[in-house]
Amino acid sequence: GSKVPNFELKDFRAQKVKSRKFFNSNKPTLFVVAAEWCPDCHEELPAVQKFYDENKDRVNVVVVFISNRSSLLDARKFVESNKYTFPVFYDFDKSIVNGFKVKGVPFNLKIRKSVIEDISEGTMTLDGLNEMFMD
């Protein structure tokens, strides 16, 4: 696996957060790149919420909303209206889209200690997410 690029995100209060904060723990991270206008994301995110509820003790979950055709406010409204409780961030400077070469959303990564172990492009189910993090 290749190493994760360093980047900054904004949380939904528009505060900047450095990527190191996510990946340095001993837990693996499910890193999902999404957009609130994306129908496949609408399909996947309920599964991500369920996965988060069931696994948050052993897996970090991070969902990043991209800034293409979107705004922090749009993303925040979408998350609030769906009552999602997983940690959410905003790719304000496109560093995620560029750094991970994201061609489409949803884009799912399994990251452990800053190394990318698995990538899955397209919609994932709860079963698929559980399989990705079996070990």
Feature-to-residue mapping (PLM):
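Conserved redox-active cysteine motifs that mediate thiol-disulfide chemistry
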Residues: V33-K50
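A short beta-strand-turn-helix
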Residues: E8-T29
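Thiol/disulfide oxidoreductase modules built on the thioredoxin-like
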Residues: K77-Y84, F92-M134
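Conserved segment of the thioredoxin-like fold in thiol-based oxidoreductases
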Residues: E54-F92, V105
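Cofactor-binding loop segments of dinucleotide-utilizing enzymes, especially the Rossmann-like FAD-
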Residues: V33-A35, V64-I66, K113
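Short pre-active-site segment immediately N-terminal to redox-active cysteine/selenocysteine motifs
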Residues: N26-T29, A34-W37, G104
